[in-house]
Amino acid sequence: MGCNAVFSSSAAKELQYSFNWYENRAKGLGIRFINFIDMTIEFIVQNPKGFQNKKGAYREAAVKIFPYQIIYEYIEQNQTIYILHVFHT
């Protein structure tokens, strides 16, 4: 069963900044980056407990190909995943 994913304003800004950075390096690279982010989030939504808790209730998911981590919190009671940060490692 899938969950709802909600982006924090910080995560949305970080994602936009990273997309712009990659897209400015090479046309289409930003789109490729977003596709890998989407695949990672889809995995999280389908398997919210698929990554270990790292700090308290927060979990970290590595993005394939790109050196990024997605930090999220899973609230089981309302089946919601809060994406808190998307950052370069």
What is each stretch, according to the model?
Residues 1-58, 76-78:
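Basic, Lys/Arg-enriched alpha-helical interface segments
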Residues 44, 64, 86:
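Conserved catalytic core of Hanks-type protein kinase domains
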Residues 59-63:
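Short acidic-hydrophobic surface loop/beta-edge motif
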Residues 31, 69, 73-89:
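Enriched for short, Lys/Arg-rich terminal
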